Amino acid sequence: MQFSDPATVLIITILAVTIAFTAVSLYTAFGPPSKQLADPFEEHED
């Protein structure tokens, strides 16, 4: 498999960006930064 093929480089780049975005999203949602997230339903007064 050659990595010099433009299509292969594009696919690997798209996969890397997608995996990185998913990892950061999961870390933000469930990791230590999730304590800083506000819940709008709990803050809303009826």
Curated annotation (Swiss-Prot):
Stretches that traverse the bilayer? 10-30
What InterPro entries does the record tag this protein with?
A: PSII_PsbN (IPR003398)
GO biological process assignments? photosynthesis
Q: Name one GO cellular component term.
A: plasma membrane-derived thylakoid membrane
Q: Where in the cell is it found?
A: Cellular thylakoid membrane
A Pfam family this chain is assigned to: PsbN
Asked if the keyword Thylakoid belongs to this entry, the reply reads yes
Coiled-coil positions are none
Q: How does it sit in the membrane?
A: Single-pass membrane protein
* Keyword terms, alphabetized: Membrane, Thylakoid, Transmembrane, Transmembrane helix
Query: What's the domain of life for this entry?
Result: Bacteria
Q: What does this protein do?
A: May play a role in photosystem I and II biogenesis.
Q: Which HAMAP family match?
A: PSII_PsbN (MF_00293)
Identify its protein family: Belongs to the PsbN family.
What is the official name of this protein in its record? Protein PsbN
Gene (name only)? psbN
